[in-house]
Design a protein with these regions (language model features):
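Extracytoplasmic electrostatic interaction patches
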Residues: 52-133
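Compositionally biased P/S/T/G-rich terminal and signal peptide-adjacent segments
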Residues: 23-71
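C-terminal motif of bacterial Sec signal peptides marking the signal peptidase cleavage site
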Residues: 15-19
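Positively charged n-region of N-terminal signal peptides that target proteins for export
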Residues: 1-4
Length: 133
């Protein structure tokens, strides 16, 4: 009897918690060139928040931070799959073995871009040639 009572109490709580979990929806409105590298796409809705001309990291040449509502999901934990597919369609190869948490690396020819995905923001960094990362 206690098993059934526990199931009757726990199941609705589980379903309630599942229903209250925020759902990540990737913004899809087209893409435009980033200010860091003309060949690297960013979402059309991306608004430039800050340019980073002289980063503190010696492996980074320059960067830019963009506000993109809805990207990254809650706490930046959701990978924007359609966006990554667009980056790859533009000729960039994801260096999955180099990923560090929120930072993803993409390479095209001799250029390496680090893309930091956070909740509602993207930061695009161009790495220096022969960067150690």
């Amino acid at each position: 009897m206690k098993k059934y009572l526990t199931a009757i109490i726990v199941l609705p709580l589980f379903l309630l918690a599942l229903g209250c979990t925020p759902r990540y929806e990737e913004p899809v409105d087209g893409y435009k060139p980033s200010s860091v590298d003309d060949d690297f796409p960013i979402p059309e809705s991306a608004a430039l928040m800050q340019t980073i001309p002289e980063p503190e990291n010696p492996n980074i040449d320059n960067g830019a931070k963009y506000e993109v509502k809805g990207i990254g999901g809650e706490q930046g934990l959701a990978t924007p799959k359609r966006y990554f597919q667009e980056i790859q369609a533009a000729g960039w190869t994801q260096l999955e073995e180099k990923q560090m948490g929120h930072v993803h690396f993409f390479q095209k020819d001799d250029t390496v871009i680090a893309l930091e995905v956070r909740e509602d923001s993207l930061t695009v960094y161009e790495m220096i040639k022969d960067a150690k990362f």
